[in-house]
């Protein structure tokens, strides 16, 4: 009886909560409920932390050079497209970079922003292959808690962003992230091409700097919410989540920077059998 009552309460809570969702995305892929993505992400975590390593335990690592080159440069092109769309749907066509609220209209620009937000959300599922490639190549040391957490939490939280607040100042971090990913995955693409291209990877340290700048800009931009008394952004809870996430990764990357470049400890080699070792977000 108690379980039945709890279930009923949960269903009522969900119904009351979901009624405020954006109807424009109701019938889009993966957007009807959070359950499909939760199942996908659960299977991803199970595969990369348990099933995959067990299946590969007595097997040789897969040779995935061509697949990784194709994958990385595809992400570069996809990120260029998403960055352009974020600019054209708001960030370069009217947003103030201050209190930019969500436009829930059916206008072409508003719908372009919604579509771009969904593309960004979907791209996070494509990026799960980062970890799958690690597992298939038996690079299990790179499948860290932080890596898996990041690749799981990004699509899961972005579902709520697209469902309720596709646009406005909560998308600035996505604009920056797509721009950074253009550079990052270009770097990984060169890495995947083998040792012959190592001479073109002298700018690895600057890649870390770029990621640090990304988190600083995200934190500063979102931090404006505390100083804008009349900002009527519809879902401020999302801004607090973004700011918390930005601060956490800013601290993690500062620690990485200090350990790698200031304290004098040696970094892992940029290339190992033609493959990169690097943090990326």
Curated annotation (Swiss-Prot):
The active site is at 150 (nucleophile). InterPro entries: ELO_CS, ELO_fam, ELOVL7. It is found in: Endoplasmic reticulum membrane. The chain crosses the membrane at residues 28-48, 73-93, 116-136, 143-162, 177-197, 207-227, 237-257. It comes from the Eukaryota. GO terms for biological process: fatty acid elongation, monounsaturated fatty acid; fatty acid elongation, polyunsaturated fatty acid; fatty acid elongation, saturated fatty acid; long-chain fatty-acyl-CoA biosynthetic process; sphingolipid biosynthetic process; unsaturated fatty acid biosynthetic process; very long-chain fatty acid biosynthetic process. Pathway: Lipid metabolism; fatty acid biosynthesis. It is an enzyme of class 2 (transferase). 3-oxoeicosanoyl-CoA binds at residues 124, 137, 139, 142, 147, 187, 204, 208, 211, 266. A motif (Di-lysine motif) lies at residues 277-281. The modification N-acetylalanine is found at residue 2. Residues 49-72, 137-142, 198-206, 258-281 are cytoplasmic. Residues 2-27, 94-115, 163-176, 228-236 are lumenal. It catalyses: a very-long-chain acyl-CoA + malonyl-CoA + H(+) = a very-long-chain 3-oxoacyl-CoA + CO2 + CoA; eicosanoyl-CoA + malonyl-CoA + H(+) = 3-oxodocosanoyl-CoA + CO2 + CoA; (5Z,8Z,11Z,14Z)-eicosatetraenoyl-CoA + malonyl-CoA + H(+) = (7Z,10Z,13Z,16Z)-3-oxodocosatetraenoyl-CoA + CO2 + CoA; (6Z,9Z,12Z)-octadecatrienoyl-CoA + malonyl-CoA + H(+) = (8Z,11Z,14Z)-3-oxoeicosatrienoyl-CoA + CO2 + CoA. PROSITE patterns: ELO (PS01188). Disulfide bonds join 99-231. The keyword Transmembrane helix applies. Belongs to the ELO family. ELOVL7 subfamily. Catalyzes the first and rate-limiting reaction of the four reactions that constitute the long-chain fatty acids elongation cycle. This endoplasmic reticulum-bound enzymatic process allows the addition of 2 carbons to the chain of long- and very long-chain fatty acids (VLCFAs) per cycle. Condensing enzyme with higher activity toward C18 acyl-CoAs, especially C18:3(n-3) acyl-CoAs and C18:3(n-6)-CoAs. Also active toward C20:4-, C18:0-, C18:1-, C18:2- and C16:0-CoAs, and weakly toward C20:0-CoA. Little or no activity toward C22:0-, C24:0-, or C26:0-CoAs. The C-terminal di-lysine motif may confer endoplasmic reticulum localization. Homodimer. Interacts with TECR. This is Very long chain fatty acid elongase 7. The lineage of its organism: Eukaryota, Metazoa, Chordata, Craniata, Vertebrata.
């Amino acid at each position: 009886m108690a379980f039945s009552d709890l279930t009923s309460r949960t269903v009522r809570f969900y119904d009351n909560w979901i009624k405020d969702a954006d109807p424009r995305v109701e019938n889009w892929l993966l957007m009807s409920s959070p359950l499909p993505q939760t199942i996908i992400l659960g299977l991803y975590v199970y595969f990369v932390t348990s099933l995959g390593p067990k299946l590969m335990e007595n097997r040789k690592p897969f040779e995935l050079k061509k697949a990784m080159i194709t994958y990385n440069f595809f992400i570069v092109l996809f990120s260029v497209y998403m960055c352009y769309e974020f600019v054209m749907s708001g960030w370069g066509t009217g947003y103030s970079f201050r209190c930019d609220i969500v436009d829930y209209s059916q206008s072409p620009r508003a719908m372009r922003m919604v579509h771009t937000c969904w593309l960004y959300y979907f791209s996070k599922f494509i990026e799960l292959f980062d970890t799958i490639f690690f597992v298939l190549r038996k690079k299990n040391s790179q499948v860290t808690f932080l890596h898996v957490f990041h690749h799981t939490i990004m699509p899961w939280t972005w579902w709520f962003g697209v469902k309720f607040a596709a646009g406005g100042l909560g998308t600035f971090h996505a604009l920056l992230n797509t721009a950074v990913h253009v550079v990052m995955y270009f770097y990984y693409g060169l890495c995947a091409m083998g040792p012959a291209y190592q001479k073109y990877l002298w700018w690895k340290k600057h890649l870390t700097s770029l990621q640090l700048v990304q988190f600083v800009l995200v934190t500063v931009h979102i931090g404006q919410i505390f100083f804008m008394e009349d900002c009527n952004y519809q879902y401020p809870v999302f801004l607090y989540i973004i700011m918390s996430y930005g601060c956490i990764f800013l601290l993690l990357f500062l620690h990485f920077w200090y350990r790698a470049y200031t304290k004098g400890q040696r970094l892992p080699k940029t290339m190992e059998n033609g493959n990169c070792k690097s943090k990326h977000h």
